[in-house]
Amino acid sequence: MKTVFFTGFPGFLGSELLPRILKRSPEATALCLVQPKFAPLARERARPLGDRVRIVEGDIAAPLDVPIGDVSEVFHLAAIYDLSVSRERGMKINVEGTRHVLDFAERCRSLQRFHYVSTCYVSGRYEGVFREDDLDVGQRFNNFYEETKFLAEVEVRNRTGLPATIYRPSVVVGDSTTGATQKFDGPYYVIQWILRQPRVAVLPVVGRPRRYRFNVVPRDFIIDAIDHLSARSDSLRKCYQLADPDPLTVDETLEVIARASHRRVIRIPLSRSVAKFAIDHVPGVYRLLRIPAGAVDYFVHPTLYDTANTQLDLPLRVPRFADYAARLVEFAAAHPEISASAMA
């Protein structure tokens, strides 16, 4: 009986992906490394899977002391998903943590596959088309989250003896069918700002919104994609950018959100630098907008993501943002208690 080793459960993606992996392999069991503070939630979410899931308390920040057994497949999703993370913490979790999982995988004698969830934003602020085989192209990074995820992917690629596959999601939002999510970030900052306003809403807009694109994919697409691609033998040693190949411009994205929110939006243009300075240094601005300065960078993002491998190997298409945005808005309006923080 094969064992799947899994990090990132019961997180935003892991909670949905683990049951899918086990459904695909009825004979498999899962060994989930979970931080002690999340262990009760992990056990609750694993309950429908019965004795097929074993929760082991631990942390990727330290060398892994867990039984290797007959682990044949590793899914590494755990990371710090925080644009404001310090470099020290990002290095400890995203880079050293990935190194510890890689070390564990190399000790697994039955290992057949290693699946690593990276991010499109290892591109940093690269100008132009960033391809699935690109990594170090001399890019500058917006923040330590991007930099440490980049360095973590370098670690994975440097382990040339491991049978690895890399998945790079773009900005992930809630389920395209239900709108459900565990965190409000990315476009949700705009959704929440607009929902707090009257029918005619004022929205600060940075840069040139008709030039830049905002790449959004729903969680269910990411889960479907990883589930399918991880089962393919020919996905071995490939990288897949799980992104919209034809994303809306920022301006189009804002208009879709406005319509879904039943608002008419008056745009107030601001430069990127002025917007970030005001949020960080002008008293009351952050409390009013509730948009972190680091999020501003993604509304003037200069990178386009090539998805050639994904389009070739995945018989699924990314749902169009305009087709499900109303569900995201409805869920956000009904759940004001959800925050922007994501589970590591």
Q: PLM ranges: what are they?
A:
Residues E57-E96, E106-C108:
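NAD(P)H-binding glycine-rich loop region in Rossmannoid oxidoreductase-like domains
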Residues E88, K92, E96-F144, T165:
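Conserved Rossmann-fold NAD(P)-dependent oxidoreductase catalytic core, especially the SDR/UDP-sugar
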Residues R140-S170, D175:
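Active-site Tyr-X1-5-Lys
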